[in-house]
A protein has these predicted regions:
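Ligand-recognition surfaces built from glycine- and aromatic
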Residues: 28-33, 195-221
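Bacterial N-terminal signal peptides
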Residues: 8-20
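Short, aromatic/His-centered strand-loop micro-motif at the edge of beta-sheets
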Residues: 147-168
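Beta-strand-rich interaction surfaces with strong enrichment in secreted/lumenal proteins
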Residues: 87-94, 155-161, 202
């Protein structure tokens, strides 16, 4: 049975539109599970920041470990020493975005002065960005704006954070509205207009050693 020409054209256009939308949606999502990266090296496009004394901001490298959330590898920050305000930052080139849905899993490994880690987004550079982080020593989650290397606390949320367990930080930022979830539990919902666009990245502090896995970025239209 032959379809009427108009109906056939409509079906073709509809299918094409659906495929185009699917392709755009897939293109707007980027995943890093670090399993295809050479162990002992930094993934391509990942750029380590600089500490105030000029040294690299951490020892970031891909690590093969049986503790990976999605085996066999993680991205690890392994520098287990640092002064109190040593922010270990790695940014990812080619991730400039404004509205986004961003998440990562992290595993606290060790640290006496500090533990845990965080997500960076809308970063101008390694000294200006938004940050949300979880700290098992303080048993809290916080969100900051970091301006010229100085943290400015936006909100705090007290939360039990178990050691030796993977956790997830999840950020959704549309316009000025920022929502943060910890293990998919909502913890922050606020508006801040300091930064409008920028790179994403990962963060630890002081002597915290942390593994990261399954980093996911979706750019929202």
């Amino acid at each position: 049975m032959k379809l009427p020409v108009r109906l056939a054209v409509w079906l073709i256009l509809t299918v094409s539109a659906v495929l185009a939308v699917s392709a755009v949606a897939e293109d707007s999502i980027r995943l890093w599970n670090f399993d295809g990266d050479p162990p002992g090296a930094l993934p391509k496009t990942f750029v380590v920041g600089t500490l105030v004394d000029g040294r690299p901001a951490g020892e970031w490298k891909v690590l093969k470990t049986d503790r990976a959330k999605s085996p066999p590898q993680v991205l690890a920050q392994l520098m287990g020493k640092g002064f109190e305000h040593a922010y270990k930052v790695v940014l990812i080139d080619g991730t400039t975005s404004s509205d986004l849905d961003l998440q990562v899993s992290f595993l606290p490994i060790e640290g006496k002065a500090d533990m845990g880690g965080g997500l960076i987004w809308r970063a101008d550079d390694d000294r200006n960005y938004y940050l949300t982080r979880a700290n098992p020593l303080e048993q809290n989650i916080r969100i900051y704006r970091v301006v010229k290397g100085i943290r400015h606390l936006l909100q705090n949320f007290d939360q039990t954070i178990h050691l030796n367990r993977w956790h997830t930080l999840h950020v959704v930022n549309r316009g000025c509205q920022i929502q943060v979830l910890y293990d998919e539990k909502p913890v922050f919902d606020l508006c801040d207009q300091t930064f409008t666009t920028g790179l994403i990245g990962l963060w630890t502090k002081s002597d915290a050693v942390t593994y990261f896995d399954d980093l996911r970025l979706q750019i929202l239209k």
